[in-house]
From Swiss-Prot:
Subunit structure: Homodimer.
Native source organism of the sequence: Mesembryanthemum crystallinum (Common ice plant)
Gene Ontology MF, one: L-malate dehydrogenase (NADP+) activity
Cysteine pairs bridged by disulfides in the record: C75-C80, C416-C428
Gene behind this protein: MDH1
Protein name from the UniProt record: Malate dehydrogenase [NADP], chloroplastic
Amino acid sequence: MAVAELSPSYKTQLKTCQQLSSSLSTRLSDHRKFSLRLLPRPVSVRGGIRCSVAPNQVQAPVAVPAEGQTGKPECYGIFCLTYDLKAEEETKTWKKMITIAVSGAAGMISNHLLFKLASGEVFGPDQPIALKLLGSERSFNALEGVAMELEDSLYPLLRAVSIGIDPYDIFQDAEWALLIGAKPRGPGMERADLLDINGQIFAEQGKALNAVASRNVKVIVVGNPCNTNALICLKNAPNIPAKNFHGLTRLDENRAKCQLALKAGVFYDKVSNMTIWGNHSTTQVPDFLNAKIDGLPVKTVIKDHKWLEEEFTVMIQKRGGALIQKWGRSSAASTAVSIADAIKSLVTPTPEGDWFSSAVYTNGNPYGIAEDLVFSMPCRSKGDGDYELVKDVVFDDYLRQRIKKSEEELLAEKRCTAHLTGEGVAVCDLPAGDTMLPGEM
């Protein structure tokens, strides 16, 4: 972002910092020490300003970067303060702070998700976090607005917030990367075009993660088409275990549980062992064969098998489109909830006998699904961020046929993006028909 674009707001930023320092000087108690300093205003091709405070409140001169020097992500407001707490006053029960990077951080989904993360709802009431928010030049003002709201919310577990537009800065040392940002499919855009446009975004983000993120970073890809975007991302991050990459199919799982509960006349917490197989598209396979209601097989509880085979899957696929008709926009809050659910499924032990759905790397899978894909399958976790595939599932011809169709689609998407995964020239022979979910067009 050019300096000229940020200059009008700099004095306002400085004034805010001066006011903050004045307020702090009168309110800080003796037992907490703050190291406060006014940082020079860096100028670079990546742009940005830094905000902090110092007792003398002298504006620093504009710093001109050396050739090749790059900017850093911006700490924001109160999060620019350096805390120096006495050892005996530190919270003894808190865990070591974890760093979470979020792309598309100025969007509606993130606007719901970030506050769940900051509140402790996702990682727990004893887990402090640092949020690193990735936006674009166009969304940078909105990104500052998000940071302001986080600042005003006074979350004790939120210890640091930084904002920026360069993934190589924002992904530095990230232990979780929630990749939400992607271009939506516009009018007249072919599916192959969307695969290419968003694939380039996730190829670049994969390279950035590979270069600067934690070697054990956990990555959840939300931007669509999420399965193939996750595959592209992991192929561009060879230093990170492929097993650490997930495509989000949890919203599909949650929707399937809701519809089964409605049909059975029970509350949705009675539905377990729900699997979404395959692609996050209209070829997805909500598995009612292995799912249970109150511990019993779904087909035992719901006698209307025609409904299960002919209507149930279509209802899940069309749920997003139905929401748009009512709400006027695609789902944001429920998507944020599903991201939170997906993370919680990895950081808390899976209840005995249950499992959850996630689109993960297929190498070594026990189901006979083609390898080298990102395919939604049933998983269990011990709560350590890792997972294992569930082996004790059953298949019938109906389920296998539909899984095969989704597999063929993902193989075609892989061929269509071969130029982004280092596997040669792309050949787009996508199956006939439009399989994008109605809520994502």
